[in-house]
Amino acid sequence: MRVAITGANGFVGRNLIALLLADIPAGEIRALVRTPRQAAAELPTADLDIRVADVTRPESLRGVFDGCDAVVHTVAIPTERHGSFAAVNVGGTRNVVAEAERAGVRRIVHLSAIGASATSPYPFLRSKGEGEDAVTAARIPSVVFRPSVLFGPGDDFFPRLGFALHFPIVPVPGDGSARFQPLHVGDLALAIRAALRRDDVLGIHEIGGPDPVTYRELLAETMAGYRKRRPTMNLPVPLMKPAAFLFERVMADPPVTVAQLDLLAVDNTPHPNAMDQVFGIRPRAFRDGGLSYLSAG
């Protein structure tokens, strides 16, 4: 099987490639990247079939899926800049689907998010929903994964959460009761591999780790991962938005945005969890040391 992976040098892409290399020769894995020099240092091996492409530029995708059996689309951005949700999460996905159809690809595996819907009131989830619609409307059999928050060495979410530890008192959006079901990136990679192999898992699947945890528990585990302790304080989300707005204006890569604050106060758990029920994968635990890699970094 020849597999193309968009965002190959990203968090999910790197971990997926490392897993697939046990089954597929490196030359059969087509790694799509935007910056080849940077990707060379991030990818597991230089023996991959590396192609330079930008999902927002259809002409750069021309021919990159030729000869591929499947495409795994991992590219997305959680932070919007100047209409980037529409350009990347929506337009980029449509471009990938169009080129995959032209190339005769036989399967698309798409990485989405819990709560994705074209009618969502939240801009990020709305963009992911519109991207999903492009995938499911395609003439290619597809598997769509909607994971809860991901963790593992190199993740982006928990270091951003850890930014709050710079403050003497850590603010908690709302009452901190919003629930999440963190999923290890290695377990997501296992599910993607199964989706590439099996014909009985087509469709949309919500996935997460074994146990739901509250936002307060996420913070506690993040503190344990960094070996730090801080008192916390509940704050209404509207009171936290001015600080997030300031971060967006003065930082190139803000730890949190106004739009993301809203999502931190909303449940993010799978209903049902397809990891065990559909894919037969028992995801690894998050609690009690799941974030120990944070202090190593």
State what each model feature region is:
Residues T6, L32, T74-V75, I108-I114, ...:
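SDR active-site strand-loop-helix element
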Residues F11-R14, V90, G129:
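Residues forming the Rossmann-fold NAD(P)(H) cofactor-binding site
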Residues R37, A46-N95, E99-R102, I114-S117:
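NAD(P)H-binding glycine-rich loop region in Rossmannoid oxidoreductase-like domains
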Residues S112, D133-D156, F163:
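Conserved beta-loop-beta element that borders a ligand/cofactor-binding pocket
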Residues I114-R126, L150-D155:
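Conserved catalytic-site region of short-chain dehydrogenase/reductase
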Residues D156-F157, G174-L196, G203:
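Substrate-positioning beta->alpha
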Residues A195-T257, P270-G297:
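Mid/C-terminal beta-alpha module of Rossmann-like enzyme folds, strongest
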